């Protein structure tokens, strides 16, 4: 469950280390977002020489959350951190590598490039 002002780790190699959610896309009065949802975020910390700079406003897709995700077979999956991948307007990732596992729910939301780059899909 990600809401505005939530800080997330960045799970790609764009140079950003941490982002803060500014806005949840997909509804005017939306309170929370989960895995596979797109958010607008501000880069709070970044490495020198990266693709994105500190203070830049970016779009990102949530790939991991601490809140459990209920699946249709009755199981839950939950991760150790909240993480996102920075994307372009055409839903393609800006980075060329993804770090850490990602949730299988991204496949339903048509983020196939992120699924293929991820080292593990849970």
Swiss-Prot record:
The keyword S-adenosyl-L-methionine does not apply. It comes from the Bacteria. GO terms for cellular component: cytosolic large ribosomal subunit. Keywords: Ribonucleoprotein, Ribosomal protein, RNA-binding, rRNA-binding. GO terms for biological process: translation. GO terms for molecular function: large ribosomal subunit rRNA binding; structural constituent of ribosome. PROSITE patterns: RIBOSOMAL_L14. Binds to 23S rRNA. Forms part of two intersubunit bridges in the 70S ribosome. Belongs to the universal ribosomal protein uL14 family. HAMAP family: Ribosomal_uL14. Part of the 50S ribosomal subunit. Forms a cluster with proteins L3 and L19. In the 70S ribosome, L14 and L19 interact and together make contacts with the 16S rRNA in bridges B5 and B8. This is Large ribosomal subunit protein uL14. The gene is rplN.
């Amino acid at each position: 469950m990600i809401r505005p002002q939530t800080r997330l780790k960045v799970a790609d190699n764009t140079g950003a280390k941490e982002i803060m959610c500014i806005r949840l896309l997909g509804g005017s009065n939306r309170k929370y977002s989960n895995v596979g949802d797109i958010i607008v975020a501000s880069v709070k910390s970044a490495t020198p020489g990266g693709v994105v700079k500190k203070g830049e406003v970016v779009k990102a897709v949530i790939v991991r959350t601490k809140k459990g995700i209920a699946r249709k077979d009755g199981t839950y999956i939950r991760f150790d951190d909240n993480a996102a991948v920075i994307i372009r307007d055409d839903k393609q990732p800006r980075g060329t590598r993804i770090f850490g596992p990602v949730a299988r729910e991204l496949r339903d939301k048509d983020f196939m490039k992120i699924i293929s780059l991820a080292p593990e899909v849970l």
